[in-house]
């Protein structure tokens, strides 16, 4: 049994901590004051860590929150979303860039989850190759709470991983899927007791480091291409974009963002 990789301790020095041990790269979300909100600065550091790991031929990556975090990540940093008349989740959005980096990284990435995962952080975790979690885990996708139009790529990520009825429940209710239910639905690969999470994840990652890295890299890329291949006519794509535009141009979107920033319940009118 392998010793667990030392957990990072939250500090104000870095939003993300990165380390390598025994062929395993560990990326630790480290912004305790903002509950690991996915700000552009934090996500840029995640991408930089992945780029560094690639040059050092890391065999597997563990993506985790700092030790003791009860919220794995609060999701998008709402303060950075445009308040009206701009696509909040466009192709160049920092989270979208990070998701592409995670999915294209040549080695497996394991999300190790202790605590709750909200909004865009669920998309980040789901874009990892595997999820190992403990009984404290929960997963919620929350655009309905904000009046936010989720992008088509994000919807396709979830449809590629989960049954459509569960995707609808997640998007329509914004209610968290917890522990055993997350395992039952296949959101997580392994659900283990909290006390065993780090050792189990490290042992699991260690097994991968002993396998053929080129074969794994090619299999991962093949699977990415096959699952991403969803031919959509240009006319249909434009129609989907226009539907989203009606949301981010709406009063409801402005109200949802303002209500969140003002820490009050949103009053949606459907306009």
Model-derived features: positions:
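Terminal low-complexity tails and localization/encapsulation signals of metabolic enzymes
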Residues: 1-14, 258-271
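CoA-thioester-processing core
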Residues: 98, 102, 118-171, 185, ...
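C-terminal long alpha-helix characteristic of the crotonase
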Residues: 132-137, 188-238, 267-271
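A short acidic, glycine-rich active-site loop
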Residues: 82-94, 242
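A structural preference for short, pocket-lining loop segments at secondary-structure junctions
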Residues: 22-30, 41-86, 101-112, 130, ...
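Well-ordered beta-strand positions
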Residues: 129-130, 169, 173-175, 181, ...
């Amino acid at each position: 049994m392998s010793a667990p990789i030392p957990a990072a301790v939250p500090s104000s020095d870095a939003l993300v901590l990165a380390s390598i041990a025994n062929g395993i790269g560990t990326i630790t979300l480290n912004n305790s004051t903002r509950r690991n909100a996915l700000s552009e600065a934090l996500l840029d550091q995640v991408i930089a860590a992945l780029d560094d790991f690639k040059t050092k031929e890391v065999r597997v990556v563990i993506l985790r929150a700092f030790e003791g975090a009860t919220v794995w990540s609060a999701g998008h940093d709402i303060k950075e979303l445009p308040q009206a008349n701009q696509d909040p989740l466009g192709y160049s959005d920092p989270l979208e860039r990070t998701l592409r980096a995670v999915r294209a990284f040549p080695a497996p990435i394991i999300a190790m989850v202790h605590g709750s995962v909200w909004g865009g952080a669920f998309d980040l975790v789901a874009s990892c190759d595997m999820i190992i979690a403990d009984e404290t885990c929960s997963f919620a996708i929350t655009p309905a709470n904000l009046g936010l139009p989720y992008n088509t790529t994000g919807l396709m990520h979830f449809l590629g991983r989960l049954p459509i009825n569960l995707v609808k429940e997640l998007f329509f209710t914004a209610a968290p899927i917890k522990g055993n239910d997350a395992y039952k639905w296949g959101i997580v690969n392994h659900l283990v007791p909290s006390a065993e999470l780090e050792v189990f994840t490290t042992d699991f990652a260690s097994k991968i480091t002993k396998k053929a890295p080129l074969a794994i890299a090619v299999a991962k890329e093949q699977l990415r291409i096959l699952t991403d291949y969803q031919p959509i006519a240009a006319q249909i794509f434009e129609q989907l974009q226009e539907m989203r535009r009606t949301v981010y141009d709406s009063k409801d979107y402005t109200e949802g963002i303002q209500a969140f920033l003002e820490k009050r319940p949103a009053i949606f009118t459907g306009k």
